[in-house]
């Protein structure tokens, strides 16, 4: 059994929303409180291992959980959020207004979508699934703390619609998904 958890809140997750991607943004105060709440939620899960994206927002969330359950987070760079290239750090509203064709393509997502100057959703899904396959072989039950896009990519892998389903799921901060 693998549990996926999204990191706690960062300032980029609060209005006005910004594209985070692979930028290393820290948890804010709400995010630190959410991490403690997540730790309480998973305390009963009898976890054998704890994995995390190395980005500080995921790592800090995993460290709070790890302290509560007695596990040290194992970092895996394949779990990071998509490299969103030229869009990273930009406001969603600005992208929608200034790059309407690109924004519309992102809202459709799918196999062919690539962030300008960044990674494709297929590349993200392939690396996330490689990491999760290694976790599954090595150490279930495990908690994997990562990112909304990484969790969506894993859900797309399990869905017959593939990456066309990317925007089907809402993955709020500290969401917990059982694979």
Predicted regions and their residues:
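Short active-site segment of divalent metal-dependent hydrolases/proteases
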Residues: 10, 150-151
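Active-site-proximal alpha-helix that buttresses catalytic centers in soluble enzyme cores
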Residues: 5-72
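Short beta-strand scaffold positions
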Residues: 52-53, 126, 145-146
